[in-house]
């Protein structure tokens, strides 16, 4: 992903220690906050689907696999789909977002928001389409869940000043995992126990809509916040 700020100067390599106020200042960057919220929702969905989908297919859709469904084989196929779809989507998502970003400053968020929106119908349809055709929908759903990986992380870097960028990434990683894939498996399990697994997958699909809303909402701030990060870099005292 292209970094709009260019190389760091000699002065920037000797930054003063990060202060608590610098960390709290990150929460005043609207595109950073909305990006983190969207990535949390995305991670929640990925964590829940990764944990529960093989078991769902074995317990609820076993008849689609013949008289003797094999959980190991289901895990193997799903794992292969996740690796292939995730890798292709990550590379293609970055390439598409970079091309669109040349004309549209908000492209990183718009590409992320539209892509994850497309995962919603694939996840819902997977619940009703018989196998082996449902594997195609699973591939499509996983593909669009990972399509945002490049652009969302590039946007994260672009809106944070270099002096706090590592801290911004660390805080983002903590939040998206603590409130994303760390809690989604037990929460989805609770929903499945109270209602059923179909309802649990509808909830996971709905969370992808929430991620889409956050990214599309944040698109209006992304260009402005990127420019502010550039200006904050240029105005740092003692810079060459």
Which stretches of residues belong to each language-model region?
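Interfacial helix-cap and linker-helix signal at transmembrane-aqueous boundaries
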Residues: 57-58, 96-97, 101, 187-196
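C-terminal transmembrane helical hairpin of 12-TM major facilitator-type secondary transporters
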Residues: 103-152
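Multi-pass alpha-helical transporter architecture, strongest
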Residues: 122-129, 202-239
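A late C-terminal transmembrane helix in Major Facilitator Superfamily
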Residues: 159-195
């Amino acid at each position: 992903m292209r970094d709009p700020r260019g190389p760091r100067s000699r002065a920037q390599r000797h930054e003063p220690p990060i202060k608590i106020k610098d960390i709290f200042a990150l929460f005043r960057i609207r595109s950073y906050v909305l990006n983190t919220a969207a990535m949390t929702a995305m991670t929640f969905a990925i964590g829940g689907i990764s944990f529960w989908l093989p078991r769902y297919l074995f317990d609820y859709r076993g008849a689609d696999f013949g008289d003797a469904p094999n959980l190991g084989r289901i895990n193997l196929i799903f794992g292969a789909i996740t690796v292939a779809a995730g890798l292709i989507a990550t590379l293609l998502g970055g390439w598409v977002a970079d091309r669109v970003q040349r004309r549209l400053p908000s492209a990183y968020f718009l590409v992320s928001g539209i892509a994850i929106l497309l995962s919603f119908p694939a996840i819902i349809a997977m619940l009703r389409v018989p196998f082996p055709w449902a594997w195609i929908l699973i591939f499509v759903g996983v593909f669009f869940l990972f399509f945002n990986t490049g652009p969302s992380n590039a946007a994260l870097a672009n809106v944070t000043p270099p002096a706090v960028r590592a801290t911004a990434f660390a805080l983002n990683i903590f939040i998206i995992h603590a409130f994303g894939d760390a809690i989604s498996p037990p929460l989805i399990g609770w929903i499945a126990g109270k209602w059923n697994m179909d309802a649990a997958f509808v909830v996971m699909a709905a969370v992808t809509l929430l991620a889409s809303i956050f990214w599309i909402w944040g698109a209006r701030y992304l260009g402005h916040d990127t420019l502010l990060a550039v200006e904050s870099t240029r105005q740092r005292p003692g810079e060459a």
